[in-house]
């Protein structure tokens, strides 16, 4: 089973697009186990409180494993985990995607309005 790291903006994009995360990820990379960091969860909890919209955080908690890595910033931690474990990162953050590409790490992004796309 492949691991997929979840970035906060990637999760929000999936929720906003109402994408079936399990089916879409399985179509892209096969069976997956979502991986999320404490920093990403904190960002999502702040967003959920500030914007008063459902971000399906219970679903994320139930379906993911909490992981930790090195880095002073959330993006640094995600980048280091992606490289060390060969995990793609679910994100729509342009800066993070650029850093991942430079490091030859894979990205999963929301493509169009209803689909996920793996970029290796």
Residue ranges and their predicted role:
Residues 1-62:
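Domain-level signal for Mg2+-assisted phosphodiester chemistry and nucleotide/NA-binding surfaces
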């Amino acid at each position: 089973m492949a691991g997929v790291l979840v970035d906060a903006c990637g999760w929000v994009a999936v929720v906003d697009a109402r994408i079936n995360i399990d089916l879409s990820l399985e179509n892209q990379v096969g069976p997956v186990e979502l991986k999320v960091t404490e920093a990403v969860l904190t960002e999502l909890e702040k967003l959920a409180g500030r914007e008063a919209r459902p971000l399906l955080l219970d679903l994320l908690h139930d379906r993911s494993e909490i992981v930790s890595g090195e880095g002073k910033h959330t993006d640094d931690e995600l980048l280091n985990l992606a490289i060390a474990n060969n995990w793609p990162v679910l994100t729509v953050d342009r800066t993070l995607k650029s850093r991942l590409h430079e490091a030859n790490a894979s990205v999963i992004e929301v493509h169009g309005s209803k689909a996920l796309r793996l970029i290796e």
